[in-house]
C-alpha cells in the first residue's frame, strides 16, 4: 500500500547534454524542458517503486508544467514527488 505523504526528491546537475540546445527544444545552453519533465516523472517513479511488487511500474499519463526560469549549465535542479 502506498503511504500518503511519501516524498522523493531527485537532484540533477545541469550539463551540456541536458540543455535545450542539445535536445533541440531551444537554442540556449540552459536546462531543457524535456529533461525537466523526465526528471519530474523519474522522481514520481522512484517514489512509487518501493510500494510496488517486483515487475510492476508506473506510467505518466498527463503533465501540466510551467518552466518559469532558465537554469544554466553548472547549476543544479531538483524535482520532488
Language-model region placement:
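Catalytic strand-loop segment that frames the active site of acyl-thioester-processing enzymes
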Residues: 1-32
